[in-house]
Regions:
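Ribonuclease/tRNase effector modules and their secretory precursors
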Residues: 1-142
Length: 142
């Protein structure tokens, strides 16, 4: 994990994007059904192409969010619901969902969408909100 750049330059973000994409490719090879049972929701959370795209676009912008992605299975299994919200119909990636469910696992925020066509819960994005990332950074730098 030491080879993950911590900066916010375009080059740092590009490296983290590639690491996230490579991680998902490996994860899918180990989880060919592309789903994990979430204990709190009592249903499977599916990982789809949209999951990968949305996550690498958002998580790669922050070092702590990138680290969180590497704990994908653990997060999908153990995150607990904290909120539910309507989708933004003007956002292309959210149009396919009836609603978004916000879950937390430690400081990690997992957003899951209820897909209209299949009624499946689909991983939308994984991030560590800035406040949490700042706290973690302060703790690890002591």
């Amino acid at each position: 994990m030491n080879d993950i750049p911590k900066g916010r330059t375009k080059d740092d973000i590009k490296v983290r994007e590639k690491l996230i994409k490579d991680f998902y490719a490996h994860w899918i090879s180990e989880h060919p059904d592309k789903k994990v049972w979430n204990h709190d929701l009592g249903t499977f959370i599916y990982v789809k192409f949209l999951s990968i795209n949305e996550t690498y676009e958002k998580a790669a912008r922050d070092y702590n969010s990138t680290l969180a992605v590497f704990h994908l299975t653990e997060i999908l299994e153990n995150a607990v619901t904290i909120d539910e919200k309507a989708t933004n119909r003007k956002t292309k990636n959210q149009k396919q969902f009836e609603k978004l469910i916000i879950l937390k696992y430690g400081e990690v925020k997992l957003t899951v969408g209820l897909q209209r066509s299949t009624q499946e819960m689909v991983q939308y994005c994984i991030t560590v909100p800035d406040e949490a990332g700042s706290k973690n950074k302060a703790t690890t730098e002591k």
